[in-house]
Amino acid sequence: MIEIPTDLPAELVPLSWLIGVWEGTGVLDYAIGDDHTEREFGQRIGFSHDGQNYLAYSSTAWLLDSDRTPLAAESGYWRLSRTLIEGDAGPGMLPGVGPRPFGTAQSVEALRASHGGFDIDVSIVHPNGVSELYIGRVNGPRIDLATDAVVRTAGAKEYTAATRLYGLVENHLLWAWDIAALGQELRTHASARLAKAE
């Protein structure tokens, strides 16, 4: 059952099923030429909000070995895709001017897209010098994302595109992540099944 926090901004209701801490296991499965990497990992994901028009996201993953060897970390922000207006904060630390937009369920309905769901923007930063901007859609308990841009530092490994799929199935968060990296075209990379921990 999905519980919507009473202090949740109306604009975040389409993403509300993500809120909380999720933990579970997954499989890393990626091939580069004749080299094939297949490992099991543990993961902890958190989605939270601070009353603004976005969800804060964080993820840590570790190998399922005796040392729980750290595997990956990422953080970012998820929000409905729309043009920001005077009532929205930013850029930088500039406060919004005037009333906050999309404060009611009725006004949020105006953002519903022709596909029946809502378009979303997701920005994710990795500590290895890669930043991703995803565009996609949330339609009920399913989210489809594809990179619109990938930015890398000069020393980062080659990484050019990705897609991600998230879904709520039998009260578990399932996800799959395909990447184009290290000279390879877009292909299967990792997936996991997570249960709500908090």
UniProtKB/Swiss-Prot annotation:
UniProt-annotated binding residues for heme b: H189
Keywords: Heme, Iron, Isomerase, Metal-binding
Pathway participation: Nitrogen metabolism
Reaction(s) catalysed (UniProt annotation): peroxynitrite = nitrate
UniProt keyword Signal, yes or no: no
GO molecular-function term, one example from the UniProt record: metal ion binding
Record-linked SUPFAM superfamilies: Lipocalins (SSF50814)
Known cofactor(s): heme b
EC number: 5.99.-.-
Cofactor: binding comment: Binds 1 heme b group per subunit, that coordinates a highly solvent-exposed Fe(III) atom.
Location of the motif GXWXGXG: 20-26
Stored Pfam families: THAP4_heme-bd (PF08768)
UniProt-listed InterPro entries: Calycin (IPR012674), Nb(III)_bact/plant (IPR022939), Nitrobindin (IPR045165), THAP4-like_heme-bd (IPR014878)
Function: Heme-binding protein able to scavenge peroxynitrite and to protect free L-tyrosine against peroxynitrite-mediated nitration, by acting as a peroxynitrite isomerase that converts peroxynitrite to nitrate. Therefore, this protein likely plays a role in peroxynitrite sensing and in the detoxification of reactive nitrogen and oxygen species (RNS and ROS, respectively). Is able to bind nitric oxide (NO) in vitro, but may act as a sensor of peroxynitrite levels in vivo.
Sequence similarity: Belongs to the nitrobindin family.
UniProt-listed PANTHER family: PEROXYNITRITE ISOMERASE THAP4, THAP4 PROTEIN
Domain remark text: Forms a 10-stranded antiparallel beta-barrel structure able to accommodate a hydrophobic ligand in its interior. In fact, this fold hosts the heme group, which is located in a wide surface cleft.
Quaternary organization: Homodimer.
Name of the featured protein: Peroxynitrite isomerase
Species annotation: Leifsonia xyli subsp. xyli (strain CTCB07)
